[in-house]
Amino acid sequence: MEFEIIFYKDSKGDNPIEEFLLELGRSNKVLTAKTRQGIAKLKNRAYHKEPLSKHLGSDLWELRIRAGNDILRIVYTFSRGRIVILLHVFIKKKQKTPANELEIARKRLKEIKIKEAN
C-alpha cells in the first residue's frame, strides 16, 4: 500500500514546498529530479529508513537528497492512516541541520496538529 503525500499549505493556501521546488528546478534540474524521485520513493515506503530518511525526534523525519555537492532536506511527518505531510524543504550547507530550519518545521507541525484536533 502506498502513502499519500501532502504538501504543507499555509493559512493563505500557499504551498512553500512546491514553490521552492519550482524555483530549484530553474537552477538545479538534477537536484530537483532527484528530489521528485525521493518523494515518489517516500510514497512507496522505500525511503522510510536510514540512510535515505532519518528520524529527527518527536514526530519529525527528514528525507535526505544529494546531487553532487548539493544536499537537500525535506522535513516531514506522518498523519492519520497512511499520510505523509511534507512540512519544510531547504538546501543544507553545513554538517549540522540549522535550528531555524527545524523550528519552521516544528511550527508547521503544530499548526497541523491544531487543525486536526478541531
What does each of the following model-derived ranges do?
Residues 1-71, 80-83, 91-118:
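Basic, Lys/Arg-enriched alpha-helical interface segments
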